[in-house]
Amino acid sequence: MDPPETVRGFILQPTYRIEGGRPVVHLYGRLETGETFLVRDRRQVARFYVRSRDREAARAAGVSGIAETDRRTLTGEPVDRVEVARPSNAPPLRDRLHRLGIPTFEADVRFAVRYLIDRGIRGSLEIRGPWQGGHAAGAAASGVDRVFDEPRLAPADWTPRLAVLALDIETDPEAERLLSIALHGCGASEVHMLCPEGAGCPAGAIGHASEAELLAGFARRLRELDPDVLTGWNVVEFDLRVLLRVAERYGGLLELGRGAGAVRLSRSWRRGPAVASIPGRVVMDGIQLLRGAFIRMESFRLDAVAREVLGEGKTLASGNGGREILRLFEEDREALAAYNLTDARLALEILERLQLVELAVERSRLTGLAPDRMGASIAAFDFLYLTELGRRGMVAPTVGAGEEPPGETAGGQVLDPRPGLYENVAVLDFRSLYPSLIRTFGLDPLNLLPEGAADPGGLVAPNGAAFRREPGILPALLDELFPRREAALAAGDRVTSVAIKILMNSFYGVLATPACRFHSPPVANAITAFGRQILLWTRNRIEEGGRRVLYGDTDSLFVETGEADPAAARRAARELAAALDRELAAWIEERHHVASRLELKFERLYLKLLLPPTRGGGRGAAKRYVGLVEEGSGRRTVFTGMEVVRRDWTDLARRVQQELYERLFAGRPVEDYLRDVLAELRAGLLDELLVYHKGLRKDPSEYTSTTPPHVAAARKLPGPLPEVMAYVMTEAGPEPAGHLRHPYDYEHYIDKQLRPVAEPVLDLLNKSFDALVGRGYQMGLF
């Protein structure tokens, strides 16, 4: 045993194991020395709470181990602590109490997460105590460098650089037979391939004589490379799931961790993505990292994302599928190895270019959650709020234990657009509106007064909810986060600024979500009610000053500047935003007696802006507009809510819409262009632009009452079904792309793809789409 020392580390995986009949916390991670570590602690007791007045009823229900505490509920009632021998004993006991009408508190907090909450540890920690090498500390620690048993822990400020390894496998068309495995990262870039005796193995590939040997060799090599993070594209749902299936077929376990234990797949909720657990490591799927970072992509397929982010794609077209992979395995293994390795490399390079692993680490350091839980906004809120509640001697209800049914929440204010084509339109934006409202008015579940309760000095929101004028948990957290984000922006630290922005913006959504223990319709509605009040106040002040507001949505207003020169328009917009900011602060101080934390900024200038009418004319269409902006030395057309940015429209519609608005803004003719498109379409020259893409949310056989086009096409597709169905409309209905038996239905595309994108532009020019298409044209039925 080495002498005590103090060292900083970062937690990759908080979990626990049962040892000697008792739960033992296990924290796996990486130290600032570069070594890996495991903290083991037997001192944590699994617990939850019940109201003190329910003590005897709980005992009658078979609950033992009840002890008095000095803690209270959010409404001020005293509570008792219920201790259980194992964390797994808590759920059935909790559910039994709920069935008897006895509410519980914090009976659903994960055991290892509770350990971190109790100590205020978020991601990074300081460890002080003796340690021993992992090889001498038992099977659970065999793959780590240092093992600390019951050390002293404290929060720390340290950011690690994690070792990341990308994995990609290739299989036969049925995803039953494993053909090759590529690994890229941690200093390696290699392909392990099934090469039975007598079969040639390509130069540079590592051959294995059987599928079982291929799997074992891969697992051994992964443990040698010892990554902190295992990643890939759809790596959990496909790669790891297939590898587990292969391991089961050979009667073994898939062991890839830093300690004893097989890879496990699970779902945190029924329709959520699968998550993988590997002892001591984190599995981060590239697709989920993108989505968790709120990065929008036209398609999340690896080829599409790689082309958009890196400027290069896969070496084979994705439409070739498993049959092409099998052909390469049989005829050209060198090409298969190159394809396999390219997929692994692209997956890792996308994460590196977008700094997605760094973002996950920073979000872990902010929220306390493990870095593979990027999308868990409710759990992040839970961690932060429960930590602060604990410091105040309070407990929160168990999710689902509340006595009141979930209430409805109202959204933000949307002003009816004034349809038309405008010049020099300024967008004024309230920065981080909902977090700023929480800070300004002290909106917090802890400050919410019970309905009907009187507080002469309280603050009343526009929805009627009343709040104490006391420091709340959320306002205090935001008071800490806002300056940290400003400092990160000033330092050019994009990762930290994005992580903080995502966290701050999640607070309102969590309060409005019934699945959250702190779900509070009065608080959520107070936030949006203040938002609506302030947006309308700002709109009225602008129009009282003689300018028109053309559109508004939640936190932004589109203002007609009335200036002919763009430079003058920008100057006027900045002056207007600054003046409104001052007036609003004075109004809030006078009306509500609080200091405004709101900030209205000039965001951008549209040199030209089109607000289209709804289909059928009349009113403007909310959340749909297109404008021309200056960027650097050039100009760019920006679409919001239009067909060009939606995946369920074809490339034909997107390409035509883009070109039409660029021509409209540039004053170039559109009719001749549309005639050319129609002629090329009917001549079959644009067939590659006619593919629809639609996700398959369930098996086609499960659609019984209706059959959407993509489902009808899927039923005609031979072989395994993709996650996203590619299909075209033919004269015989929808058919899978690449498997057509009938001619394209060009009139369908004219009616359903060209008409919707062309008519708004033609209407502005007083032109008719039907006249352009040709005399006697009738709308198709489908």
Regions found by a protein language model. Give the residues of each.
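DnaQ-like (DEDDh/DEDDy) 3′-5′ exonuclease domain used for proofreading
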Residues: 2-226, 341-342, 346-365, 369-411, ...
